[in-house]
Amino acid sequence: MSLKIQLGMAQVDEAILADLCRRYHVRELSLFGSAARDEMRPDSDVDLLVEFVPGAKVDLFEYSGLMLDLSKLIGRKEDLVSKKGLKPLIRASVLKEARLLYAARAPFSQRHY
């Protein structure tokens, strides 16, 4: 049985989202904005916060590919924001309301116990 993640008004298969994140070297993917606050309207986009695996070479082509694939998966327009690129003025509020959707597991050699 596959688990479903509520992404705004859409339900997304957790395994498919995880595969997509691994393909694009995503370390963490979080939901924020109206979808995270359960205030979405039919015309709302889905706000997603992304952090890439350290050292991953993510160029504009790959970033755009991730955006396109997420839009297809969700079935609506999304606004993908890099955690690194968050403006200081909104950073605290975005991080406070962010709901984690995916987190990559650290390789065994990098885990801290």
Annotate each language-model stretch with its function.
Residues 1-28, 36-42, 53-113:
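Catalytic core of pol beta-like nucleotidyltransferases
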Residues 31:
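Conserved histidines in hydrophobic membrane contexts and catalytic metal-binding motifs
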Residues 49-51:
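Short hydrophobic/aromatic beta-strand micro-patches
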